[in-house]
Amino acid sequence: MLLAIDVGNTNTVLGVFEGRRLLDHWRVETSTRRTSDEYGILVRQLFTHRGIDPMKVTAVVVSSVVPPLQSNLEKMSERYFRVRPMFIGPGVKTGMPILYDNPREVGADRIVNAVSAYERHHAGVLVVDFGTATTFDAVSPKGEYLGGCICPGINISMEALFQNASKLPRVEFARPPHVIGRNTVHSMQAGLVYGYVGMVDGICARMQAELGFPVKVVATGGLASLVASESKAIHQVDEFLTLEGLRIIYGRNHAS
């Protein structure tokens, strides 16, 4: 079995594969204060809770945008699963040319998403990932990573409103009953939801015009479904895009 770990700034998503089949997945808080033993015990408890034997894990692959966690995840993998993890980064075969001024600058999660989306569609794609940052990544019909946009994430924007406007409360990112809010909470929700929908549709339209070829727009991330339900640009939501990309890239580096 393959344990795939996607470490984001806010959350860490784990998935366990048996061959091409995703057996289960979990989302936990990303914490640089958690030790390697704490991570190991947590992951083994998640496995046990779902009736999965952790001793059947034969490989671990990690995509991380939090460098301080690399050492702990490496120790966790070696101690609790007895395997050396593969980290997505320079030197790893992705099968995708990266046409970026400095390819080393591109976040591992963005490349993993691009590989996963292209593998599924084999056409021009735009990937919109609603994480701590909201990212847009373009892939050519030839499977080349072209670049993209990085915007403040939804939760960052909500927290900024709360922190910097003393009379505004924290609100849930949820669809309000009307675009024209009739109270403060609904007004903030309208601005956040429809503001992000407008941003997504606007950036996708501009990127498609610049690319000059048709693209499939694929969204992923915890808040993707809500935005996609109001968006005119998003064609598909793929909750497991990053985990599948990790599986694909691991396979390309360990072909039997």
UniProtKB/Swiss-Prot annotation:
Top-level taxonomic group: Bacteria
One function term, GO molecular function aspect: ATP binding
GO cellular component entries: cytoplasm
Pathway of action: Cofactor biosynthesis; coenzyme A biosynthesis; CoA from (R)-pantothenate: step 1/5
Keyword check for Kinase: yes
Obligatory cofactor(s): NH4(+); K(+)
Matching Gene3D superfamilies: 3.30.420.40
Organism, as annotated: Myxococcus xanthus (strain DK1622)
EC numbers for this chain: 2.7.1.33
Binding-site residues for K(+), renumbered to this chain: D129
Record note on quaternary structure: Homodimer.
Sites where the protein binds ATP: D6, V7, G8, N9, T10, N11, T12, V13, T132
Residue positions of the active site: D109 (proton acceptor)
Keywords: ATP-binding, Coenzyme A biosynthesis, Cytoplasm, Kinase, Metal-binding, Nucleotide-binding, Potassium, Transferase
Family: Belongs to the type III pantothenate kinase family.
Binding-site residues, substrate: Y100, G107, A108, D109, R110, T184
Name of the protein: Type III pantothenate kinase
Localization (cell): Cytoplasm
GO biological process: coenzyme A biosynthetic process
Catalytic activity: (R)-pantothenate + ATP = (R)-4'-phosphopantothenate + ADP + H(+)
